[in-house]
Amino acid sequence: MSVWRAKCEWWLALAALVLLPSLASALTTQSLDSGWQFRLAPSDPHAKTHPRAAQWLPATVPGSAQTALMALKLVPDPYWRTNEPAIQWVGLSNWQYRTHFDVDAVTLARGHVDLVFDGLDTFADVYLNGHKILSADNMFRRWRVPVKSLLHAGANTLEVRLYSPIGRVLSWLLKQPYALPGEFDSPFGDEPRGKQTANYVRKAAYQYGWDWGPRIVTVGIWQDVKLESWDALRLKDFSIAQPVVTADIAKLQAQLELDSDVAGTARVALRWRAPDGSSRTMDHDITLKPGDNAVAIPFEIARPQRWWPVGYGQPNLYDFHVDVTIAGNALAGADRETGLRSIELRRQKDKWGKSFEFVVNGVPIFAKGANVIPMDMFPTRVTPARLARLLESARDANMNMLRIWGGGYYLPDDFYATADRLGLMVWQEFMFGGAIPPANQAFRDNVRVEAIQQVMRLRDHPSIVLWCGNNEVETGWESWDDRKAFKQSITPAQRAQIEQGMRELFDRTLRDVVAKYAPDVPYWPSSPGTDYEGAVNVTDNGDYHYWNVWSGDALQATAYLDVTPRFMTEYGLQSLPAMATIDAFTEPKDRSIDSPVMRAHQKYDRGAHYDESRGNQRLLKYVEREFGKPKGFAALVYLSQAMQAEGIQLAAEHLRASRPESMGSLYWQLDDVWPGITWSGIDWYGRWKMLQYHARRFYAPLLIAALRNKGVTTVSLVSDGTTALPVRWRVRVMDFAGKVLSEHTADATLAPLSGTQVARFTDAQLLDGADPRKSFAVFDLLDGDKMVSRNLVFFDAPKNLALPVPHVDAQLMQEKNGCALTLSSHTLAREVWVSFGDLDARLSDNAIDILPGQHVTVTVHGNASLAALRKALKVQDLATVMAGAPR
């Protein structure tokens, strides 16, 4: 009977295809991104003060009301000087968008037509031809609505009414018995202090203001809009699950989700191309039922060409393609690119507590990298090229992991595809930046749909090695002063409800989504966290955020050497951006550290007003602690970057030398959201600070770490390599003129995947009577005669040393693949910094220590001519800048 029924279903499906030829057509897409207009909602109070914005005006989709108004010159650039207040009204207003589009008879004849919004920001009502079809409330969700019955042949009108996310929530919040603790109070008075609305909205939290960026709460249609039409079948999703991946075999599953109008048999043709160019095809028959169909097709690949993180092998990628046919008619198809690898978050008890290490294809990887924040206040301005440049900069600095911080937004596919190709691992967080979330079920249900959509979208990217529930929600609730005060202000029952809601969200809802839709990737509920095994932000379990340097007690950078967590996911020091960047957002009169403009572009420790930050005084404190009082603003720019780079280097090298006790160093932060004074190593224009060049060296695969703490220098050899390497290491003590006062060389075997301490020296042992103000130690790691790593140790802060002011000779010559710049000095030249103003130029190395008599050649890449480079060339060094000497 079952055989007869199957045959009947097959013939019915075939008959349907024969009788209705349109059923044989695959899904088609019609973009609706063009022709949009926008205006202030007529009833909005701001319409009177901004009458031009109340008229229908051209808008770009994807985009925001803010970017559209900026393009029309109706609001100023908020990044320029102190313009941030002038754009605030936009996020407090309600807006209307509309477009007109044609639909042809072919589309109307299809079995299904859906209107799809890939992203609405955030509260929106959508009307098609006057009919309300959707109410949206989540920036991170895709919205799909069947609309065939509402479409007209010919012209159609689509309208989107967007509501201020602040206004939408605030009136409700003010009526509640309490407001959940958030992040940063608005400096503009649009929210009462302590009454933050961002907690309650599924929207990018950073747009409400952070300690590294302005407050610009966007409103708009921020991703693509389209019509999708199809007939018998829609392929909703296609992915490659990886239950088992070893060197010998990959046991995989092609997973398909199909929406079908017909019952019967369909054929799935799966083909793939391996990284070496070989290919294979397999066919599989499946039985469809009307409605949703989940299909899993197991298959194997012998001796897979596995994906490896950069530095450990090739980031090999397979191309998979699937076609679904019924009776020979191709109805659906899709492509996926993925890498085959196994991921483990290994946590085992050991003598230091409990380990926290990423194991890829069986190899424990020390994570070297930084945190990524949104690259702009306006997400649609971030192009694929900008994303690629940022990731390439990370790769070029020997990083292998980036943490996508949870206060921004889920990044576009281009980001993860580039990370896949570069071999960069991604620590991916769900979008919770630290505020306490609502405890109600409706909120969790909304987040669950968001999480399913995002995990399904991103699960084929081999670069994603962790899904993390949130940033700092758990540690904030546990230990931050404002959270402690809040807990005292509410009833025990209210506290229990909030805590249960957080546990439900981060330990169950999100964990369950990852387990179901991306089971090959580990889940971690909070950063920092211990997976609910006790107190969080501890050094012997889980990951760790360390802010007693810079924030908290404002300890000296050497305090990094006293802390050895299992995995450090945040630590950082601030610096100013390049002078060329500062010039781009200031006038000459603004270029002093305490000017209103420079205060407005510093968001750390901000006061009640947007330009009352005290962060620049903290920055000065750190600079003066090391270098003394800067001789002018340009000197401060240079010295702040040197302070930042050398401090982060101490921490990173300590963590690497502590392997396997510590297995990760992710400093805060890689990039900038705007041109400001922040913790970044790359500023908003993409210019590398000194930190990024230092990172290239302190994250190098082979490292000699010479770390001086309390008068004792500990020497360690570090290797990311997977095989042992015979090496020599050497220490020389010199005076600043280059005279060698003592020298010691030793042979060693550099163990694979290790940090090994090889020596400890007291200051007295190294100096042996030499003047500590006029001497320094040079530690070299040698592979044969090749120096592969070098570190210098000084015996006091630079301001207390008798550093000579060197003459750094710079010779710039044209070569086949760019320009070669040779630098030399007769005396020690520290932190030699080469810049070319605002020219497009990137150096292969910079912020270099040049030993007396040493010649260092670096390559200059870029589009500028040799003549232009020579004219713009500027060379600085630490002693000259500290002395205020002309150059």
Where are these regions (language model features)?
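Carbohydrate-binding surfaces of carbohydrate-active enzymes
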Residues: 256, 596-845, 850-861, 866
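Accessory beta-strand-rich segments of carbohydrate-active enzymes
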Residues: 32, 39-43, 87, 92-234, ...
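Extended carbohydrate-recognition surfaces in non-catalytic/accessory domains of CAZymes
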Residues: 26-116, 196-224, 228-233, 348-352, ...
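Substrate-binding/catalytic cleft of secreted carbohydrate-active enzymes
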Residues: 401-421, 425-602, 643, 647, ...
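Short acidic/polar inter-strand loop motif in beta-rich domains
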Residues: 164-170, 326-331, 782-789, 882
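Extended acidic/polar, glycine-enriched regions
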Residues: 149-157, 255-349
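Active-site-adjacent substrate/metal-binding segments within catalytic domains
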Residues: 70-103, 108-117, 121-128, 134-137, ...
